[in-house]
Amino acid sequence: MIAIGTTLEEKVFFLDRALLKAYADASGDQNPIHQNEEFALSVGLPNVIAHGMLTMALVGKYVSDWAGGAAGVKEFSARFVKPVIVPADQRVDVTVSGVVSAVVDDRITIQLSATSAGVVVLEKSEAVVIK
């Protein structure tokens, strides 16, 4: 039974520079802050950062997997608060979790959280699913 307060199982995704390159190629977003460490540092970032929409896509996958497919996801929103930092030659985690905050008929509202290296990267994130 799904009820208010139900905690969804946490999922950890891993990102590295190769994934950022593949995402940049697929999305057409070749902004050098996502691939060039020297450039990222020159504009005040701590290192190369993941594409925000890649981070949001991982959270979306988490929700759609839980909902039994993308068709069950009726609403999805998030607020970016910190970038996911991806140093060279390292895999970094994006850990996603959720808690049911409302159940009305067949509509379930989930409050979502995403962290990387223990730092909150998305907040005020919410999904509404039909299950």
Each predicted region: which residue ranges?
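Generic secondary-structure boundary signal with a strong preference for alpha-helix termini
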Residues: 17-18, 40, 56, 64, ...
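Hydrophobic beta-strand-centered segment that forms part of the acyl-chain substrate-binding groove
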Residues: 43-46, 56-95
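Catalytic strand-loop segment that frames the active site of acyl-thioester-processing enzymes
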Residues: 1-50
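Hydrophobic residues on conserved beta-strands that form the core of alpha/beta folds
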Residues: 10, 73-75, 124
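HotDog/MaoC-like acyl-thioester-processing domains
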Residues: 1-8, 88-131
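Generic structural detector for well-ordered beta-strands
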Residues: 12-14, 79, 128-130
